């Protein structure tokens, strides 16, 4: 491999050289903050611009970009950013090399050569490019319908993650390929189904007493609370539990390392559940009052139900075996779910009598279809203000100046019912038949008992005693006086990459809930809620005046027949099915694609996806670079880097930070900000963005001003409820959104305040919402719309009903999923979390004889983010080649030594990576690196076929609910790459001319990628 020559000193020295080169060139004619606000600086004076890093595409690290004479010369951590503690990782520092890279796209280009060959790019004008796009899209739409045009999106680039929503509406297509399908999406999908959108996000920033780091190395990158924050959280925790097949960086410091076999997370989660239940470590009040655990299951009747709302606002029908008033009484409400009350006789003696004797009910009529008691128990007494009574939270290890948040006391039942969790009861149905019913908890308890530690030990490879010890440590409250659990579970990307993605996430959601860690300090809280829109409100599919496709268009979504729940979810089509449709025309032709930073290497079998890309009639790609995927494009459009654009920014997870991405320097040449490109397309297609006469296609300044309008000193509208003996009344408070006085009239004012103040704490901005815990009790969990929490000042949209509970069909955290039950009636086992053995894994019959090793992948690399940064010299010098981690004992069996190139093979493909001997993986497991390509290779595709790991996967091995690819835990074989078994007689991958890829740290080609400042005007 050669010697790694880049040291920290070299890193800093190179930065100094970069700065000197930057100073030699004058400022751009366009306005950036450093030029506008600090125009008085002269000579070599520098300006530090506070902004938000996007070097890893997910984390909102606060950083400062140092600008000298209009040129960014380095990135530093912002010590005032409480959410990231001044962190500035290698990817962030390398952003300067990305922004000033000689291979940046500067102009629109069109291809001149056939697909599959070197594209022969030719520069064209923006007008020609955009008109060509409109003409081709309209032609394809006229021939095949809007559904023949698909949209694709990846991560980062600030705003592009919602581009597919815009184009879907504009083109009337239901088809969008998203990285979301395999990254965060299954977690968001599952939690939306059973609790609340993205409740997978954990408030690690308040430093829980027990820190559970499950399936990720967030100390390297990714997620709200990563890098320096993660290290600090783990170090301060009383107990740190790491769950990972490999010894991760922080794993060696953990108190418990749950060293599981890849793909067995679901079994381990259910084993933890079994321990929690058997040791009675669950929060009994929460389980009885805020989950559907006490709801009664009747297996002797046909499932029935009611219409309820999808995530997009349309309706679907719940069909459930949970017992309802309509099942026992003609004309009864299908929304009233029955429970058995252990206290019914005592209450009766006190003069409180239930309508159905020992049975009482909870009314989930959240839309008020039948009556207004929806959201409340029979005869309940409830008051919103009493629900807020409590105290300031008391987390021990907050940073100085960090807000604690308000912690309402747990609210007991009033009247003092006691819903039964266990037992079997008889009840007569409306047809006269007497049946036996059991609480959901009994079924859940039985499911968990199938995975006792002794059973899970056989599946996961972790000793039963270690499973029990870790689960007990998590569930046993270190300080019971707090009234809440030890902290949530930071379950990360790895748990999504299996055919059990959704069920895995449900198991974690339940675990967090039953242990009293839902929306509590250090618990799982979901996405940060603030009045600004971190995705640019005006540049989203929810823009004022934006039209949406008719329902019949959504019903055409590709993959919906194979994955019925996608019709409920509606936020992506199945990527596997879409690529198949491009190739086969089944179920209908898909002939065009619009892509913003999407990456065909991230999911599905790469070879199959490449075939589809080469088969498209027309493909447009927006990007910073020439990439493997856009080598198949017909037109490529250059976009701005994160230091070259403006965007409001709030933590996407639970870190609770609000700030901005600030334009520090001008983009090069003709590169544009994604929203401006899409707005131009809308104008050319005569698709009105707003309903404001004369401003149908607003410019970026209007959009930025619009994005911060609801940030105000006024108290935004909220609702309080008063319920007496089951009869509710409500009262509106605060200022209607259309009447609020914006705190900042313009984006520039907001940015100026941000430069002076730094990052704001969402707890201070929205004290009734993000500043308050247990929002399911106060009503604030339902304060915003059911998915994104967006507010639309134009029509009062986005405001919820402020009723206590969750946004689920039962208004409870659903241990028994009515969504799953309704969409998969033929799979009753899926109503509760399940464990499924990975396909093509070590239990896959005789296959293990030919493919004896289990492959996992996806680990975080300090200098890369998925496929990004392979052309940045600092990063590539430190990590020039993909590495496969192999246990030294295993390597010895195969005659493999450190640094050898190794073939890794399945029946679907084979790749080469470099052996990295590491005792941190088990002897029967190898750990592969993912999404590798080689920018130095000029052949079409830039050498993706050499090392791209997803060539090895079964294209049709998918999660049956979300369609997520099975990206890990499959069997492979390995053997040493030799001159005899390698093309060009070279174990090192070579391009079509026989030239090897960059594979050593001293390759002179790295210097060709050093920053350049010419040709940007």
UniProtKB/Swiss-Prot annotation:
Residues annotated as site: Crucial for dopamine dehydroxylation activity: 506
Catalytic activity, as annotated: dopamine + AH2 = 3-tyramine + A + H2O
Cofactor remark from the record: Binds 1 [4Fe-4S] cluster.
Processing after translation: Predicted to be exported by the Tat system. The position of the signal peptide cleavage has not been experimentally proven.
EC number: 1.1.-.-
Pfam hit, one: Molybdopterin
Annotated residues for binding of [4Fe-4S] cluster: 53, 56, 61, 89
Limits of the 4Fe-4S Mo/W bis-MGD-type domain: 45-103
Protein name: Dopamine dehydroxylase
Originating species: Eggerthella lenta (Eubacterium lentum)
Gene behind this protein: dadH
